[in-house]
Structures are given as C-alpha cells and as structure tokens.
Amino acid sequence: MTQDSALLKAPEQTLRDGSNSRKVFIKTYGCQMNVYDSTRMSDALARDGYEPTEDMEEADLVLLNTCHIREKAAEKVYSALGRLREMKKKKAADGREMMIGVAGCVAQAEGEEILRRAPAVDVVIGPQTYHRLPEALRRAKEGQRVVDTEYAIEDKFEHLPVAESRKIRARGVTAFLTVQEGCDKFCTFCVVPYTRGSEVSRPVSQIVEEAEKLVEGGVREITLLGQNVNAWHGAGPRGEAWSLGDLLYRLAEIPGLARLRYTTSHPRDMDDRLIAAHRDLRALMPYLHLPVQSGSDRILKAMNRRHTAAEYLSLIERIRAVRPDIALSGDFITGFPGETDKDFEDTLRLVEEVRYAQAFSFKYSTRPGTPGAELKDQVPEEIKAERLERLQALLLKQQQEFAESCIGKEIDLLLEKPGRMPGQLIGRSPWLQSVNVDAKASQIGDIIKVRITGTGTNSLFAERAEAAV
C-alpha cells in the first residue's frame, strides 16, 4: 500500500470570529491510509478556520503526516524538522508565528523523543488521536508542548467532520475510505501492529454514510482502505455477521457509485464471500493487491505469515477461476534474515507462476522493536541489493508484458484529470493503469469506452472506441 510523498490541503473556511483564515500546509508520507488521514485532518482543521496553501513559507501551521514502515523513516522526519526549525526561527524574527506538528506513525513510535530532538515542534499526535488535533493546537498556543499518542477510547471517526459536497468535488472523482485499521498478524518484519494498534473495524452504517457523502460530492470510484482490509468485519442490518465481501455487496448498491476497490489484503483473510464478490459485482474492479512477501515456505514461516507458497498459489487459482480478467499485484521483501539463494529462487519461481500486472519490492530493513530485528543471519546489504535488482527486473518485465497485452482491448475508462497535453485527459483503467486519451475537461468523471493503442513508461494510450479504425 505505498505512495510517494504527497501534499494534501485543508478545505477553505473563514474563522468563526470573521477574521482572516490561517494557512495550513500538510505534507503526507507513505501509504494511501496516510493520504486519507491527511484529508480527514484537513476537514477537522477547517472548522478552526485553517485554509490550504501549497506554499510552506506562508503557512501558519506545517503538519508532517509520517510513515514508519521503512528504515530511516524517523531520521528523514528529523531532517525535515531541522529545516522547518530554521523557517520557524526566520518567521519569528519577522514577527510571524508558525506552528509545527508531527502526525502519523513516526509520531506514534517516537512520541516524546520528537520533542526532545526537535524542540521547535509544538504538537505530536498519533494516527488514532488526530481527531483531537484542533484541541492539541489550542493547548500548544497556550504554551504547552503536546504529545497525544495514546490509543483513544472513543471512536475518532465519530468526532471527525465529513467534508461538504463542494469540497469533495474539488478533490476529484476518486476517493479513499478507511474501513479498517491496525493489524493482529504480527509479521516479524512489520511495525504496523505497534504503530497502528490492533485490528479495528468501522461499523457498516458509518462506512455507508461516508460513501454516500462521497458519491453526493461527485466521487465515482471508492477504494476501501485498511492495514489488513479483508479482516474487516461487522454486523449486518439484522445483526448477522458480515465480512468484507458483504460490505462490498452493500456499497455496490449505492446509486452513482460506479467502481469499488480495496487494499491491502492478507491471504489468510480472503474468504469465500469476498471471492464471490469478485465474481458477482460489476462495480468491483478486476484488480487485487495481495502481498506474499516471499516464495519460500521457510522464510514465510520465519516472517510469521501463517500460509505457504502453495496455499497462496491455490488462492490465486480460485480467484482467477471466478474472475479470469483479474490483475494481480503484490509486495516482496528480499534479504529477510536467513534468506538463502534457494529461498530467493523460490520467490522468483512464484513470481513466474503468478505473473503480476505490477508489484512492489523492497530490501529488508531492520525495524527496531520487531522480532525480525532480533533474528540471526542478517543478510549483507550487497546481497539484498543484488536480489532486489533481479526481482525488480522480472517484475518490470511482467508489468510491461501485461501492459502490452492490453493493446487492442476495448475498456471502460474513468476520466479523472487533465493530462499534460492540451485536449488530453488521464483516466484509470479497471486494472489501475493511467491511460491518456483525447477528451474534453467537461467529461471528467465520465466513464467512456476506449481502445488501448500503445504503452508508455508508466501509462497507456488510448482512443475513443467509436473513433477507432
């Protein structure tokens, strides 16, 4: 579930006392859930009159929403905070105030240490308490240095405002919606259970209400998010037990919601109902991100994945049997402690058998506090890097082959945003690819029939199907 740093902005709103709005700059690192969290923090800040800026220099509040998955994540944050300290000092000399906040998983993991190492920081707030951000800022303005990383007893989503339709519309025709947080799997390489906590599922009514609000605001495609999204569970209208598949069936009933996706999944939680949803729901896109991490049973056991390579392959076979056009994505780690050449070759064999449309791969990075950090037989960095290079070459080859296999196909394309060229829009294919096509800006949000004509580095090209020769 990875994404490069992104900027998200709070919606516009004037202060309750009628004075000029304050400016907020939010920088988001990491996964899609952090992107979603930044959006919800923006909505919460809007109630206190914070409006967006893309210029950090003019911000009254700079908020870093951080990620802790990779090695040196914290050091990158401290480096950014060093630059912000100088900016804050310069503004103070000019008689201007700037507050600095750190949110997200580094905030959760580091807590008070952030205030010790970065004295310019005013607020540190965790991913389970960001609904209390406005109050934390008020306390900071009174001179307190605030750390709020305790797991909240109350449901944060009940305390967060939902944006108005006009603000949702300004954000685009696709949206994220968090339905589940935390993880109970305790893979030995992963910090998520320690930074996001145990698995928690949002109630059906809350999810449906938010989805309906998004659709009212012009959203055509919703991606359901969770650290382990297919572990979501809840109660149906008669109190019956629901799993993610049931939730997808319910959301597919919302008028105007054309497309559904979900990420990130664990193989152990792909149940029959969810597989049936892939078979039955036209709105559920034929794309599945299903991380496996390794093709070696020995390494999978050391990772505490609790499934074998054969079980993963069998699951893929079952899914493809009901949805032959589904495209697979995955995550892989090279150089996990104890990984031998044979273990790595097992991973390559699994990749060859699955044939991914795209995948994400990383060198193993030691995360303090995880069981993996205590394992012996740590793999040398040069071997990790060499294996990663080989794996990525294979995955890139498969991605290119999948893209080329799309040439000549007619597909339904959701038009999302302007392209780089005049008269061009960028749309999203059912398989999550960016597709360039000539279309009018007024068509953003439409789903049109196109024919794929070619491939680019990270995108496809298409023409309107009715205009195709």
UniProtKB/Swiss-Prot annotation:
Protein residues bound to [4Fe-4S] cluster 1: 31, 67, 105
EC number: 2.8.4.3
Key words of the record: 4Fe-4S, Cytoplasm, Iron, Iron-sulfur, Metal-binding, S-adenosyl-L-methionine, Transferase, tRNA processing
Compartment list: Cytoplasm
Family annotation (Pfam families): Radical_SAM, TRAM, UPF0004
SUPFAM superfamilies per record: Radical SAM enzymes (SSF102114)
GO CC field: cytosol
Domain MTTase N-terminal: start-end pairs: 22-142
GO molecular function: 4 iron, 4 sulfur cluster binding; metal ion binding; N6-isopentenyladenosine methylthiotransferase activity
Cofactor note: Binds 2 [4Fe-4S] clusters. One cluster is coordinated with 3 cysteines and an exchangeable S-adenosyl-L-methionine.
Cofactor(s) needed by this chain: [4Fe-4S] cluster
Entry similarity comment: Belongs to the methylthiotransferase family. MiaB subfamily.
Function: Catalyzes the methylthiolation of N6-(dimethylallyl)adenosine (i(6)A), leading to the formation of 2-methylthio-N6-(dimethylallyl)adenosine (ms(2)i(6)A) at position 37 in tRNAs that read codons beginning with uridine.
NCBIfam families named in the record: miaB-methiolase (TIGR01574), MiaB/RimO family radical SAM methylthiotransferase (TIGR00089)
Name assigned to this protein: tRNA-2-methylthio-N(6)-dimethylallyladenosine synthase
Originating organism: Rhizobium etli (strain ATCC 51251 / DSM 11541 / JCM 21823 / NBRC 15573 / CFN 42)
Gene label: miaB
